[in-house]
């Protein structure tokens, strides 16, 4: 069960009740999308940053979303205060509740975005398996990687057996709220062959009642590498159980749910849960066909199973009192999703009219089959069965030319055929609400094929080794996923959704500068992004719609300064103005996007290698609540947190102690406002929103985490 679909169901309920990359002045072109990492130094003209394995190891943050939040342009929404990032959402350039559908996630350069609202599960990647993370901001990534890269692309590059740092390693963690984790990795190399395996196991009681987590992850890769031929085979699997505490009202409601934000650790849904099991196989090879010409072929199959159960906690007869012992299953979700792909491409380096030139061109094909049963309880005949197939076939090319030793230009394009076939099988006999629908609740069949296109134009000019400017323009698109086409449903939601969501499109332009003075580095850029048919969920009616035109205007600046050999500081600031351009909400803010956010950090090698101190502070400004397109409700308050980590190494042993949220801030960064009730059989005229009423997901205060381990 995805975080997005969970938020949809909770939203429907509340609607009823209430590293900076330096430039080099040289003719050689930056590598783009070749071999193991398809991003490397990024596309010309884009704002790109890299997080290394050393950055991850030294950071007090112990999950990917919090590590990523220490980069400009990125904000995070937490639902469960989970130490490993389970159910967290990473938002790149201001997309709020559906951020996960507007950021394209890659692992080793391959798409891993699932065809549902869970998107990418950050908790499924062991941190000890990561070699680096590459972030490319803006629309340009769609040209190379396909639909969904509206806010940008995040590429997680995993260690290989021959990677630096990929040694045999074991480590253990213990922390607040019964958090325990074990990690292990092993690597070996023999001639052209190498193998690496990484895994971890997590158990946590969680900050809130019914927020327990059990997670298991493993990935392994076999590689073969010679100068003219390389190949790999990888397998990854993960298994998760997650309790699902809903949001808490901001006031006590006699006769309603018993707990409010006055007791933030409590849960009004102590029985709800979600499970996930997934396995992924990938294989591929790269071969040098002739000098400067390389063929790269990848293929993969991913299969994911998800189950979730939601309960009705109110008695079915007067006085309709809240009960846990008498709670009955209200909604059960059993989903199977299979995605297969093949992506052949050519990387050609040559001279074009005497100028160094690199051309990357290829085809990618993805086929996803989504089947979801929705009975009221396990073992019963489904009320709805959703069967959706999506196929995409893309053709793309990206050409990069060194016009001069100090100037590069890139131009690329993609055309992509998108086909969707969707069916809903409805059983009125098994639907307790069957008699209340004004029309047939079965979603009409939907079959569609369309062509979409993406483009990128980028330019970079280096005035010297110390100063460069860059700019780009791009077009991108994203398709509605299965959960967005299905909607939320649930009791008292009598609007029948449609599978027919329009494709979201976007144009953006960006310009910036880079400064590299050795000890001091800085990157700053401004951008404008204009979108049409942005896909969004409305809890008041329980379905997804295409919004009126929207836009983002932003400024991002990141800096790094090496004070001396032992001490370095970093910081960044982000401004995003995300608004509606047209329609009844023209000029209003997009919910769940803070205009201002930032981070600052200090790393001090107190005793080099033996003792290191890292201090990180993160700040996000106030933001509109989910479901508050009208901008009438209170704001989610601004907040800042400080994390501290002290760690060291001796011989082959290492240790660390982290204190997170040092000043014990009690806050939330996700809340959903009352949106009223749409017209229906129980409320023919509908009900307006209740101003000041909202549900929030409170987060933990001060926590600690201890680590010890060894390499061998």
Residue ranges and their predicted role:
Residues 37, 65, 69-110, 114:
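Extracytoplasmic beta-strand/coil segments of soluble accessory domains associated
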Residues 142, 153, 157-188, 199, ...:
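Short strand-turn segments of transmembrane beta-barrel domains in outer membranes
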Residues 110-138, 157, 500, 539:
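Short acidic/polar hinge/loop motifs at secondary-structure boundaries
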Residues 284, 288, 294-300, 304-312, ...:
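Membrane-embedded beta-barrel scaffold of Gram-negative outer-membrane proteins
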Residues 229-236, 275-433, 460-462, 520-526:
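Face-selective signature of the C-terminal outer-membrane beta-barrel domain
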Residues 477, 569, 619-628, 648-712:
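C-terminal beta-signal and adjacent terminal beta-strands/loops
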Residues 174-203, 208-247, 271-290, 294, ...:
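Transmembrane beta-barrel wall of Gram-negative outer-membrane proteins
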Residues 409, 417, 521, 526-531, ...:
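Gram-negative outer-membrane beta-barrel transporters
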């Amino acid at each position: 069960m995805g975080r997005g679909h969970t938020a949809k169901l909770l939203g429907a309920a509340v609607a009823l009740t209430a590293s900076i990359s330096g430039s080099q002045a040289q003719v050689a072109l930056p590598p783009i999308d070749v071999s193991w990492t398809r991003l490397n130094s990024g596309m010309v003209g884009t704002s790109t940053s890299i997080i290394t394995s050393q950055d991850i190891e030294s950071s007090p943050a112990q999950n990917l979303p919090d590590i990523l939040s220490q980069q400009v342009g990125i904000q995070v929404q937490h639902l469960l205060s989970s130490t490993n990032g389970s159910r967290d959402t990473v938002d790149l350039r201001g997309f709020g509740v559906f951020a996960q559908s507007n950021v394209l996630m890659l692992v080793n350069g391959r798409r891993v975005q699932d065809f549902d609202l869970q998107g990418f599960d950050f908790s499924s990647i062991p941190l000890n398996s990561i070699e680096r993370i590459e972030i490319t901001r803006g629309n340009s990534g769609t040209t190379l990687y396909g639909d969904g890269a509206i806010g940008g692309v995040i590429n997680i590059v995993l260690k290989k057996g021959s990677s630096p740092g990929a040694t045999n390693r074991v480590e253990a963690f213990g922390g607040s709220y019964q958090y325990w984790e074990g990690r292990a990795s092993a690597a070996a190399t023999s001639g052209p062959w190498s193998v690496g395996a990484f895994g971890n196991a997590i158990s946590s009681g969680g900050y809130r009642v019914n927020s327990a987590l059990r997670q298991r992850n493993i990935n392994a890769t076999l590689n073969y590498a010679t100068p003219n031929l390389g190949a790999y085979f990888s397998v990854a699997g993960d298994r998760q159980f997650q309790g699902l505490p809903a949001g808490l009202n901001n006031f006590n409601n006699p006769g309603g749910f018993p707990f409010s934000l006055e007791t933030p650790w409590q849960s009004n849904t102590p029985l709800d849960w979600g499970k996930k099991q997934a396995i992924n196989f990938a294989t591929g090879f790269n071969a040098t066909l002739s000098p400067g010409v390389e063929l790269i072929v990848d293929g993969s199959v991913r299969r994911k199973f998800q189950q979730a159960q939601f309960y009705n906690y109110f008695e079915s007869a007067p006085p309709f009192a809240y009960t846990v012992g008498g709670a009955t299953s209200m909604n059960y979700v059993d989903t199977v999703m299979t995605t297969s792909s093949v992506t052949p491409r050519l990387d050609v380096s040559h001279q074009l009219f005497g100028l160094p030139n690199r051309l990357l061109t290829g085809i990618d094909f993805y086929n996803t089959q989504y089947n979801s049963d929705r009975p009221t309880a396990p073992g019963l005949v489904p009320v709805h069965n959703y069967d959706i197939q999506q196929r995409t076939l893309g053709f793309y090319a990206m050409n990069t030319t060194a016009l001069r030793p100090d100037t590069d230009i890139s131009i690329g394009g993609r055309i992509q055929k998108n086909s969707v076939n969707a069916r809903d099988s409805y059983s009125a006999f098994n639907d307790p609400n069957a008699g209340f629908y004004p029309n047939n609740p079965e979603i009409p069949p939907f079959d569609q094929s369309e062509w979409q296109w993406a483009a990128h134009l980028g330019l970079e000019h280096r005035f010297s080794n110390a100063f460069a400017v860059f700019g780009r323009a791009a077009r991108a698109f994203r398709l509605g996923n299965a959960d967005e086409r299905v909607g939320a449903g649930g009791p008292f939601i009598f609007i029948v959704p449609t599978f027919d969501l329009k494709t979201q499109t976007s144009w953006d332009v960006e310009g910036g500068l880079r400064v590299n003075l050795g000890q001091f580095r800085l990157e700053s850029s401004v951008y404008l992004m204009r979108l049409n048919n942005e896909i969004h969920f409305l809890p008041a009616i329980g379905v997804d719609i295409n919004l009126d035109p929207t836009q983002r205007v932003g400024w991002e600046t990141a800096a790094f300064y090496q004070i001396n050999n032992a001490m370095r500081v970093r910081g960044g600031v982000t401004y995003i103005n995300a608004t509606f351009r047209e329609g009844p909400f023209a000029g209003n803010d997009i919910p769940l996007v803070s205009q201002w956010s930032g981070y600052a950090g200090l790393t001090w090698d107190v005793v080099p290698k033996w003792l290191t101190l890292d201090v990180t502070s993160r700040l996000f400004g106030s933001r509109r609540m989910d479901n508050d397109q009208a901008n009438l409700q209170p704001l989610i308050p601004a907040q800042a947190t400080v994390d501290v980590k002290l760690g060291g190494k001796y011989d082959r042993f290492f240790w660390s102690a982290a204190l997170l949220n040092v000043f014990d801030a009690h806050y939330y960064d996700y809340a959903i406002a009352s949106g009223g009730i749409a017209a229906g059989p129980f409320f023919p005229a509908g009900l307006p929103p209740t101003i000041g009423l909202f549900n929030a997901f409170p987060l933990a205060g001060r926590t600690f985490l201890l680590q010890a381990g060894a390499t061998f």
